[in-house]
Protein backbone atom coordinates (compact mmCIF):
# COMPACT_ATOMS: atom_id res chain seq x y z
CA UNK A 1 0.00 0.00 0.00
CA UNK A 2 1.16 3.53 -0.72
CA UNK A 3 -0.25 4.76 2.58
CA UNK A 4 1.74 5.03 5.80
CA UNK A 5 -0.92 4.21 8.42
CA UNK A 6 0.79 3.38 11.71
CA UNK A 7 -1.77 0.67 12.57
CA UNK A 8 -1.55 -1.28 9.30
CA UNK A 9 0.68 -4.20 8.27
CA UNK A 10 0.32 -3.27 4.59
CA UNK A 11 2.82 -0.42 4.93
CA UNK A 12 5.61 -2.07 3.02
CA UNK A 13 8.41 -1.55 0.59
CA UNK A 14 8.14 1.09 -2.08
CA UNK A 15 7.47 1.42 -4.94
CA UNK A 16 4.26 -0.59 -5.00
CA UNK A 17 4.55 -3.85 -6.93
CA UNK A 18 1.80 -4.47 -9.48
CA UNK A 19 0.49 -7.21 -11.74
CA UNK A 20 0.08 -6.51 -15.43
CA UNK A 21 -3.43 -5.85 -16.72
CA UNK A 22 -3.16 -8.90 -19.00
CA UNK A 23 -2.25 -11.10 -16.03
CA UNK A 24 -5.24 -9.83 -14.06
CA UNK A 25 -7.49 -10.36 -17.08
CA UNK A 26 -6.41 -14.01 -17.35
CA UNK A 27 -7.09 -14.56 -13.66
CA UNK A 28 -10.51 -12.94 -13.90
CA UNK A 29 -11.35 -15.14 -16.88
CA UNK A 30 -10.60 -18.24 -14.77
CA UNK A 31 -12.67 -16.82 -11.90
CA UNK A 32 -15.52 -16.08 -14.30
CA UNK A 33 -15.40 -19.60 -15.78
CA UNK A 34 -15.89 -21.01 -12.28
CA UNK A 35 -19.04 -18.95 -11.77
CA UNK A 36 -17.67 -16.77 -8.97
CA UNK A 37 -19.82 -13.65 -8.61
CA UNK A 38 -17.86 -11.60 -6.07
CA UNK A 39 -14.19 -10.59 -6.20
CA UNK A 40 -12.49 -8.72 -3.37
CA UNK A 41 -9.48 -6.66 -4.45
CA UNK A 42 -7.02 -6.77 -1.56
CA UNK A 43 -5.20 -3.52 -2.39
CA UNK A 44 -5.65 -1.27 0.65
CA UNK A 45 -5.71 1.83 -1.56
CA UNK A 46 -7.12 0.87 -4.94
CA UNK A 47 -6.87 4.43 -6.28
CA UNK A 48 -3.27 5.18 -5.27
CA UNK A 49 -2.43 5.45 -8.99
CA UNK A 50 -5.26 7.11 -10.93
CA UNK A 51 -4.14 5.86 -14.34
CA UNK A 52 -3.86 2.26 -13.21
CA UNK A 53 -7.14 2.46 -11.30
CA UNK A 54 -8.86 3.67 -14.46
CA UNK A 55 -7.37 0.78 -16.47
CA UNK A 56 -8.60 -1.71 -13.88
CA UNK A 57 -12.11 -0.23 -13.85
CA UNK A 58 -12.23 -0.55 -17.63
CA UNK A 59 -11.08 -4.17 -17.27
CA UNK A 60 -13.82 -4.86 -14.71
CA UNK A 61 -16.39 -3.74 -17.30
CA UNK A 62 -15.45 -6.84 -19.31
CA UNK A 63 -16.97 -8.93 -16.49
CA UNK A 64 -20.38 -7.31 -15.84
CA UNK A 65 -21.74 -10.31 -13.91
CA UNK A 66 -18.98 -10.04 -11.28
CA UNK A 67 -19.24 -7.59 -8.38
CA UNK A 68 -15.89 -6.11 -7.35
CA UNK A 69 -15.20 -5.07 -3.76
CA UNK A 70 -12.68 -2.22 -3.56
CA UNK A 71 -11.15 -0.16 -0.77
CA UNK A 72 -10.38 3.42 -1.78
CA UNK A 73 -8.92 6.48 -0.13
CA UNK A 74 -11.43 9.25 -0.93
CA UNK A 75 -8.81 11.98 -0.39
CA UNK A 76 -6.74 10.66 -3.31
CA UNK A 77 -9.44 10.72 -5.98
CA UNK A 78 -8.41 12.53 -9.15
CA UNK A 79 -10.96 14.35 -11.30
CA UNK A 80 -10.36 11.83 -14.09
CA UNK A 81 -11.15 8.93 -11.78
CA UNK A 82 -14.24 10.68 -10.45
CA UNK A 83 -15.56 10.92 -14.01
CA UNK A 84 -14.79 7.25 -14.60
CA UNK A 85 -16.75 6.28 -11.48
CA UNK A 86 -19.73 8.32 -12.66
CA UNK A 87 -19.88 6.30 -15.89
CA UNK A 88 -19.82 2.84 -14.32
CA UNK A 89 -23.00 0.74 -14.31
CA UNK A 90 -24.85 0.27 -11.06
CA UNK A 91 -23.90 -2.84 -9.10
CA UNK A 92 -20.42 -3.34 -10.60
CA UNK A 93 -18.59 -2.01 -7.54
CA UNK A 94 -18.87 -2.32 -3.79
CA UNK A 95 -16.80 0.59 -2.47
CA UNK A 96 -15.38 0.96 1.01
CA UNK A 97 -14.08 4.43 1.80
CA UNK A 98 -11.37 4.34 4.44
CA UNK A 99 -12.16 7.43 6.47
CA UNK A 100 -10.84 6.03 9.82
CA UNK A 101 -11.70 9.25 11.70
CA UNK A 102 -13.04 12.75 11.12
CA UNK A 103 -10.53 14.24 13.59
CA UNK A 104 -7.29 15.76 12.31
CA UNK A 105 -5.24 14.90 15.46
CA UNK A 106 -6.31 11.26 15.17
CA UNK A 107 -5.36 11.06 11.50
CA UNK A 108 -2.05 12.83 12.11
CA UNK A 109 -1.08 10.42 14.90
CA UNK A 110 -2.12 7.50 12.67
CA UNK A 111 0.02 8.88 9.81
CA UNK A 112 -2.93 8.71 7.44
CA UNK A 113 -2.16 10.31 4.05
CA UNK A 114 -4.29 13.03 2.50
CA UNK A 115 -6.31 15.96 3.81
CA UNK A 116 -9.48 15.29 5.78
CA UNK A 117 -11.33 17.91 3.72
CA UNK A 118 -10.39 16.07 0.51
CA UNK A 119 -11.48 12.75 2.01
CA UNK A 120 -14.89 14.14 2.97
CA UNK A 121 -15.31 15.75 -0.45
CA UNK A 122 -14.50 12.42 -2.11
CA UNK A 123 -16.93 10.55 0.13
CA UNK A 124 -19.65 13.11 -0.52
CA UNK A 125 -19.16 12.66 -4.27
CA UNK A 126 -19.47 8.86 -4.01
CA UNK A 127 -22.62 9.10 -1.96
CA UNK A 128 -24.16 11.44 -4.51
CA UNK A 129 -23.69 8.99 -7.39
CA UNK A 130 -26.81 6.90 -8.10
CA UNK A 131 -24.67 3.98 -9.31
CA UNK A 132 -22.64 3.77 -6.08
CA UNK A 133 -23.30 2.76 -2.49
CA UNK A 134 -20.04 3.48 -0.70
CA UNK A 135 -19.38 2.30 2.83
CA UNK A 136 -17.51 4.49 5.31
CA UNK A 137 -15.21 2.88 7.87
CA UNK A 138 -14.22 4.37 11.25
CA UNK A 139 -11.78 2.79 13.72
CA UNK A 140 -12.46 2.86 17.47
CA UNK A 141 -9.45 2.85 19.77
CA UNK A 142 -7.11 5.06 17.75
CA UNK A 143 -5.02 7.48 19.84
CA UNK A 144 -6.67 10.87 20.62
CA UNK A 145 -10.12 9.43 19.78
CA UNK A 146 -12.85 9.84 22.44
CA UNK A 147 -16.13 7.95 22.83
CA UNK A 148 -18.40 10.95 22.24
CA UNK A 149 -16.62 11.57 18.93
CA UNK A 150 -17.70 8.17 17.58
CA UNK A 151 -21.32 9.14 18.13
CA UNK A 152 -20.76 12.62 16.67
CA UNK A 153 -19.08 11.34 13.52
CA UNK A 154 -21.96 9.08 12.56
CA UNK A 155 -24.07 12.21 11.99
CA UNK A 156 -22.13 13.74 9.04
CA UNK A 157 -21.59 10.31 7.47
CA UNK A 158 -25.34 9.68 7.64
CA UNK A 159 -25.80 13.15 6.16
CA UNK A 160 -23.77 12.10 3.14
CA UNK A 161 -26.01 9.00 3.00
CA UNK A 162 -23.19 6.47 3.18
CA UNK A 163 -24.63 3.07 2.34
CA UNK A 164 -23.07 1.61 5.48
CA UNK A 165 -21.18 3.07 8.43
CA UNK A 166 -18.74 0.58 9.91
CA UNK A 167 -17.17 1.16 13.32
CA UNK A 168 -14.40 -1.37 13.80
CA UNK A 169 -12.13 -1.87 16.82
CA UNK A 170 -8.42 -1.20 16.39
CA UNK A 171 -6.14 -4.25 16.46
CA UNK A 172 -2.47 -3.68 17.28
CA UNK A 173 -0.95 -6.19 14.90
CA UNK A 174 2.66 -7.37 15.26
CA UNK A 175 5.06 -5.42 13.08
CA UNK A 176 3.07 -2.19 13.01
CA UNK A 177 4.49 1.14 14.13
CA UNK A 178 1.56 1.76 16.48
CA UNK A 179 2.21 -1.51 18.30
CA UNK A 180 5.85 -0.55 18.79
CA UNK A 181 4.71 2.78 20.24
CA UNK A 182 1.83 1.37 22.30
CA UNK A 183 3.38 2.14 25.68
CA UNK A 184 4.31 5.69 24.69
CA UNK A 185 0.81 6.28 23.30
CA UNK A 186 -0.87 4.81 26.38
CA UNK A 187 -2.52 1.96 24.48
CA UNK A 188 -3.29 -1.31 26.26
CA UNK A 189 -4.21 -4.25 24.06
CA UNK A 190 -4.93 -7.95 24.33
CA UNK A 191 -1.81 -10.15 24.13
CA UNK A 192 -3.84 -12.71 22.17
CA UNK A 193 -4.98 -12.56 18.53
CA UNK A 194 -6.51 -10.46 17.11
CA UNK A 195 -4.69 -8.11 19.59
CA UNK A 196 -7.71 -5.86 20.09
CA UNK A 197 -7.21 -2.54 21.89
CA UNK A 198 -8.63 -2.64 25.44
CA UNK A 199 -8.14 0.99 26.49
CA UNK A 200 -6.17 4.13 25.67
CA UNK A 201 -5.37 7.41 27.39
CA UNK A 202 -8.57 8.78 25.85
CA UNK A 203 -11.03 5.90 26.21
CA UNK A 204 -11.66 3.39 29.00
CA UNK A 205 -12.45 -0.32 28.84
CA UNK A 206 -16.12 0.40 29.49
CA UNK A 207 -16.26 3.12 26.86
CA UNK A 208 -14.74 0.82 24.24
CA UNK A 209 -17.45 -1.69 25.11
CA UNK A 210 -19.99 1.07 24.43
CA UNK A 211 -18.28 1.69 21.07
CA UNK A 212 -18.69 -2.01 20.22
CA UNK A 213 -22.36 -1.79 21.14
CA UNK A 214 -22.72 1.29 18.92
CA UNK A 215 -21.17 -0.75 16.11
CA UNK A 216 -23.79 -3.48 16.66
CA UNK A 217 -26.54 -0.87 16.56
CA UNK A 218 -25.26 0.51 13.26
CA UNK A 219 -24.92 -2.96 11.74
CA UNK A 220 -28.36 -4.05 12.90
CA UNK A 221 -30.30 -0.97 11.86
CA UNK A 222 -28.49 1.66 9.75
CA UNK A 223 -26.54 -0.91 7.71
CA UNK A 224 -29.62 -3.08 7.12
CA UNK A 225 -31.49 -2.02 3.94
CA UNK A 226 -34.93 -2.63 5.47
CA UNK A 227 -34.30 -0.18 8.33
CA UNK A 228 -31.70 2.10 6.74
CA UNK A 229 -33.94 4.97 5.63
CA UNK A 230 -35.83 5.26 8.93
CA UNK A 231 -32.70 4.93 11.06
CA UNK A 232 -30.91 7.55 8.96
CA UNK A 233 -33.82 9.97 9.33
CA UNK A 234 -33.92 9.45 13.09
CA UNK A 235 -30.16 10.13 13.30
CA UNK A 236 -30.35 13.30 11.21
CA UNK A 237 -33.38 14.75 12.98
CA UNK A 238 -32.18 14.11 16.53
CA UNK A 239 -28.48 14.22 17.39
CA UNK A 240 -29.23 12.43 20.66
CA UNK A 241 -31.01 9.52 18.93
CA UNK A 242 -28.02 7.16 18.86
CA UNK A 243 -27.40 7.66 22.58
CA UNK A 244 -31.07 7.19 23.46
CA UNK A 245 -31.66 4.22 21.17
CA UNK A 246 -28.51 2.48 22.42
CA UNK A 247 -29.61 3.04 26.03
CA UNK A 248 -33.00 1.58 25.09
CA UNK A 249 -31.44 -1.55 23.55
CA UNK A 250 -29.24 -2.01 26.62
CA UNK A 251 -32.19 -1.54 28.97
CA UNK A 252 -34.23 -4.27 27.27
CA UNK A 253 -31.15 -6.56 27.21
CA UNK A 254 -31.04 -6.96 23.42
CA UNK A 255 -27.95 -5.06 22.28
CA UNK A 256 -25.72 -8.14 22.62
CA UNK A 257 -28.32 -10.66 21.45
CA UNK A 258 -28.81 -11.95 17.88
CA UNK A 259 -31.96 -10.43 16.39
CA UNK A 260 -33.88 -11.43 13.28
CA UNK A 261 -34.80 -8.82 10.69
CA UNK A 262 -38.42 -8.87 11.90
CA UNK A 263 -37.38 -8.56 15.54
CA UNK A 264 -35.31 -5.47 14.78
CA UNK A 265 -38.27 -3.94 12.98
CA UNK A 266 -40.54 -4.51 15.97
CA UNK A 267 -37.93 -3.01 18.30
CA UNK A 268 -37.62 0.08 16.12
CA UNK A 269 -41.40 0.40 15.96
CA UNK A 270 -41.76 0.10 19.74
CA UNK A 271 -38.99 2.65 20.29
CA UNK A 272 -40.69 5.14 17.96
CA UNK A 273 -44.04 4.50 19.64
CA UNK A 274 -42.59 5.34 23.06
CA UNK A 275 -40.13 8.11 22.19
CA UNK A 276 -40.96 9.69 18.82
CA UNK A 277 -44.55 8.83 17.83
CA UNK A 278 -44.32 11.02 14.73
CA UNK A 279 -42.24 8.19 13.18
CA UNK A 280 -44.58 5.39 14.23
CA UNK A 281 -46.38 5.22 10.89
CA UNK A 282 -43.09 5.26 8.97
CA UNK A 283 -41.82 2.42 11.15
CA UNK A 284 -44.98 0.43 10.44
CA UNK A 285 -44.63 0.92 6.67
CA UNK A 286 -40.94 -0.10 6.76
CA UNK A 287 -41.81 -3.25 8.71
CA UNK A 288 -44.59 -4.21 6.26
CA UNK A 289 -42.35 -3.62 3.24
Model-predicted regions and their roles:
Residues 57-59, 86-88, 153, 181-186:
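Short, hinge-like loop/turn segments at secondary-structure boundaries
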Residues 21-143:
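Conserved SAM/AdoMet-binding glycine-rich loop
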Residues 1-22:
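Canonical Radical SAM [4Fe-4S] cluster-binding loop centered on the CxxxCxxC motif
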Residues 11, 42, 168:
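Conserved residues at the C-terminal ends of beta-strands
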Residues 80-85, 143-161:
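Catalytic cores of alpha/beta
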Residues 3, 50-51, 99, 105-110, ...:
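Flexible glycine/acidic-rich beta-alpha junction loops that bind and position SAM and/or redox cofactors
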Residues 39, 68, 134, 163-167, ...:
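Acidic/polar loop patches that form or flank catalytic/metal-binding clefts of enzymes
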Residues 214-289:
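Radical SAM enzyme core and accessory elements
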Amino acid sequence: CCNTCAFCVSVGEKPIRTLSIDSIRRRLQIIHEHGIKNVRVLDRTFNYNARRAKELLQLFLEFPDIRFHLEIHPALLSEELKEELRRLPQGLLHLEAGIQSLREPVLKQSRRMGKLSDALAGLELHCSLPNMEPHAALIAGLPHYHLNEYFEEVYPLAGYNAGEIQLESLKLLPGTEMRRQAETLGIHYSPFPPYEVLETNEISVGELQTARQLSRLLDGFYNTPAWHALTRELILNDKTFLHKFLEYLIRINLIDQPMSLEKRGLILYEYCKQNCPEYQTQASIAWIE
